[in-house]
């Protein structure tokens, strides 16, 4: 099964930022082909240092030892480890003035919104956050 998640939530809505990565990791662990496409405020999570500073405060945000609260970046790394692919909207990256060296290493690629539209039409499911 092919699943695409459109991630428009970002630093302005921190309480919405963990669940997409958590759900993506669960789906990938169950052999789904999962991509997350970042756009709008979600694109800001791709800048180095941003996601590390956001703690969503949801019940699933405790680390495995139950002590440290997980950051959004921890959830991004978990999803990446599960096999989730990360892509961003080129127009959003350009409008924020981000350069390749500004972006987290987990990002797999940047392409225009038109490519997202084509991928979304081919996917079995599209989720938006």
Give short role names for the model-derived ranges.
Residues 77-80, 85-91, 98-100, 105-107:
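Ligand-binding beta-strand-loop-alpha-helix segment within the catalytic cores
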Residues 54-87:
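A glycine-rich helix N-cap at a beta->alpha junction
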Residues 7-10, 56-64, 98-103:
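Short, basic, glycine/proline-bearing loop/turn elements
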Residues 42-55:
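N-terminal beta-loop-helix "entrance" segment that forms/cooperates
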Residues 34-40, 86-90:
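Short internal beta-strands
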Residues 28-29, 80, 120-121:
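Anion (oxyanion) recognition and catalysis
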Residues 5-18, 46, 64:
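Short, glycine-rich nucleotide/cofactor-binding loops
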Residues 17-30, 36:
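Histidine-anchored nucleotide/phosphate-binding helix
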């Amino acid at each position: 099964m092919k699943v695409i998640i459109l991630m428009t939530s970002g630093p302005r809505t921190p309480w919405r930022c963990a669940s997409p990565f958590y759900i993506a990791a669960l789906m990938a662990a169950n052999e789904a082909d999962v991509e997350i496409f970042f756009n709008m405020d979600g694109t800001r999570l791709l800048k180095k240092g941003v996601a590390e500073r956001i703690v969503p405060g949801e019940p699933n945000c405790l680390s495995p030892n139950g002590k440290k609260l997980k950051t959004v970046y921890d959830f991004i790394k978990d999803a990446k480890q599960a096999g989730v692919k990360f892509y961003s909207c080129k127009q959003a990256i350009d409008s924020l003035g981000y350069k390749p060296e500004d972006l987290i290493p987990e990002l797999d690629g940047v392409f225009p919104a038109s490519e997202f539209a084509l991928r979304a039409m081919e996917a079995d499911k599209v989720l938006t956050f």
